[in-house]
Amino acid sequence: MSFLSFLLGQKKSSASVAKERLQIILAHERSGRGDSPDYLPQLQQELVAVISKYVKINPDDIKVHLERQDTLEVLEVKIEMPQSETQASV
């Protein structure tokens, strides 16, 4: 009988289903708390490190912003690039 129940799947108790649903709701609410996620400062630091390999920039010249609108999230990254020496002399 256990093999048959394995194939057909066991029906979960209503308590375990309710617990799973509450965990999903809590995780969703926790992820929406605050204006900016925890990873934004680290993302900004990593962007500075990568871009600094190729171009000399000031860490303050990179701005990372997350905007939420209903179900849409927009990650905006603004990087102020220094003028090249040829452009600066013109």
From Swiss-Prot:
GO terms for biological process: cell division; regulation of division septum assembly. It comes from the Bacteria. SUPFAM superfamilies: Cell division protein MinE topological specificity domain (SSF55229). Keywords: Cell cycle, Cell division. InterPro entries: MinE, MinE_sf. The keyword rRNA-binding does not apply. The keyword ATP-binding does not apply. Belongs to the MinE family. Prevents the cell division inhibition by proteins MinC and MinD at internal division sites while permitting inhibition at polar sites. This ensures cell division at the proper site by restricting the formation of a division septum at the midpoint of the long axis of the cell. This is Cell division topological specificity factor. It comes from Bordetella avium (strain 197N). The gene is minE.
